[in-house]
């Protein structure tokens, strides 16, 4: 695990096979996370989100791929978009965030979101993205973002969280608890009274403190 960051990943679904996917990778002291939400109710949604994760995994393991150059990620999004459109296997949102020692960069498209929560503010990294434009339509124009090194807690999640919970409640939970506990509470937050979920949920929380990481 990178000594600079701690992270937790949580996935929840009513179904045997979720259409949401999230993974965290490391290259040296750089953390790379990807999150994808296959188009709900469409054939191949899980295949599409899985293809996005697989493309990022391949990029991270390719020594030629410059993970801290945002243009490389823009190009990757376009390659995935074209491949999914050609094969007609489904559509997916996509968020990639790269956390290095000096900066945070990322690329996104669709309605999954990435925020940085600090003590008194919320920085919506994905503000301005094309929420209706998913990978697999063959015309993606991803939004890019760049910030200084992470200060606060990074929250990246699908609309299974953001569509069903208020910003101020999400922020309160993240600020009040360690990230492992916060991840569990965020999933519980969007459960219905029956205990089921209105939608699949995938989320990743990252903090700058070097504590242990967990997968839920």
Descriptions of predicted regions:
Residues 1-216:
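PP2C/PPM-type serine/threonine phosphatase catalytic domain
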């Amino acid at each position: 695990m990178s000594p600079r960051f701690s992270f937790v990943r949580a996935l929840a679904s009513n179904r045997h096979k979720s259409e949401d996917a999230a993974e965290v990778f490391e290259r040296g002291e750089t953390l790379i996370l990807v999150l994808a939400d296959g188009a709900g109710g469409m054939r191949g949604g899980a295949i599409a989100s899985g293809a996005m994760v697989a493309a990022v995994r391949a990029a991270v393991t390719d020594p030629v791929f410059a993970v801290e150059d945002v243009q490389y990620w823009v190009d990757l999004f376009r390659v995935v978009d074209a491949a999914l459109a050609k094969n007609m296997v489904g559509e997916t949102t996509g968020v990639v965030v790269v956390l290095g020692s000096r900066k945070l960069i990322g690329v996104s498209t669709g309605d999954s979101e990435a925020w940085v929560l600090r003590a008194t503010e919320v920085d919506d990294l994905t503000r301005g993205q094309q929420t209706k434009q998913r990978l697999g339509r063959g015309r993606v124009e991803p939004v890019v973002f760049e910030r200084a090194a992470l200060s606060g807690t990074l929250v990246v999640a699908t609309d299974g969280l953001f569509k069903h919970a208020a910003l101020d409640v999400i922020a309160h939970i993240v600020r009040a608890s360690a990230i492992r506990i916060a991840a569990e509470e965020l999933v519980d937050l969007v459960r219905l009274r029956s205990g089921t979920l209105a939608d699949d949920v995938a989320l990743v929380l990252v903090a700058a403190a070097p504590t242990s990481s967990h997968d839920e």
